[in-house]
A protein has these predicted regions:
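N-terminal leader/linker segments that precede catalytic domains of diphosphate-processing enzymes
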Residues: 2-258
Length: 258
């Protein structure tokens, strides 16, 4: 069984190198410095129906600089305001240890909040919880997904998050991220889907056929990871010690688990 899985993984790596990465990851000019990574977070949302499991994906605008036209999970770059958000439910302590933030609870919470905030901004969907006396952020420069939530009396519900994995953009890209992928069950969501300038199409796609869409290798990898577990969030939660880190080294995809 173990040998079979290893063979499957090697086959997947070779296929992904040819099909995905070259299309959606920009290349830096030769002899330029390697770009520093920026912290980012995505929220993978799954919906279970009687027949199948579906995943929420959005199509990026063709006008965007990074991965134009690719289908992605909602998410984005960590913002300074994500550190200022009060009154959230607690993120699982075991997840904090997996995020590579030196067990810094504030940094871990900020990443989790970023995934929820970006999802609100890009899709209109909210992973939130009603709270009494919600504190609004007294900063005129902050007008984002968390502001939208606070006006509805909601706070980010970090307790509903499950950790899927992380990824680092390869060094040959001029735009690089250290992304953490959280996930949650759609039954916990509030709000309605609405397209934005960033995601011009948003759909619930059957998990088993989702990789047929144009997407980056890391998105495909994470979807295949979900398929391995049949989209079972509770099972993935129990298998926390086996979460992947996805990157590229020496021109090849590099996947570690610990």
């Amino acid at each position: 069984m173990k040998k079979h899985k290893i063979m499957q993984q090697k086959k997947y790596i070779a296929r992904s190198m040819v099909k995905k990465e070259l299309k959606f990851t920009p290349k830096k000019e030769k002899d330029t410095k390697i770009a520093r990574t920026r912290d980012a977070a995505s929220l993978v949302l799954l919906k279970k129906t009687r027949k199948e499991v579906k995943v929420l994906l959005g199509k990026r605008s063709e006008k965007t600089r990074f991965m134009p036209g690719a289908w992605v999970f909602p998410g984005g770059v960590l913002d300074k305001s994500d550190y200022k958000i009060p009154e959230t439910t607690k993120l699982n302590n075991n997840i904090i240890q997996k995020l590579v933030v030196s067990n810094n609870v504030q940094a871990a919470n900020a990443l989790a909040i970023a995934s929820i905030r970006e999802t609100v901004e890009e899709t209109g969907l909210i992973l939130g919880k009603k709270a009494k006396n919600v504190s609004h952020i007294n900063d005129e420069n902050i007008n984002n997904g968390i502001t939208i939530m606070s006006k509805k009396g909601l706070v980010p519900d970090l307790a509903k998050l499950v950790y899927l994995g992380r990824a680092i953009t390869p060094t040959f890209s001029p735009i690089r991220f250290h992304a953490r992928f959280f996930m949650a069950d759609a039954k916990h969501l509030l709000g309605k889907i609405k397209t934005t300038s960033e995601l011009v199409e948003i759909k619930w796609i059957p998990l088993k056929t989702a990789t047929k869409l144009p997407m980056a290798d890391v998105t495909e990898f994470m979807i295949n990871e979900l398929i391995e577990y049949n989209g079972d969030i509770s099972l993935i939660k129990r298998k926390l010690e086996n979460r992947p880190m996805f990157t590229w080294k020496m021109g090849k995809q590099w996947i570690t688990r610990k």
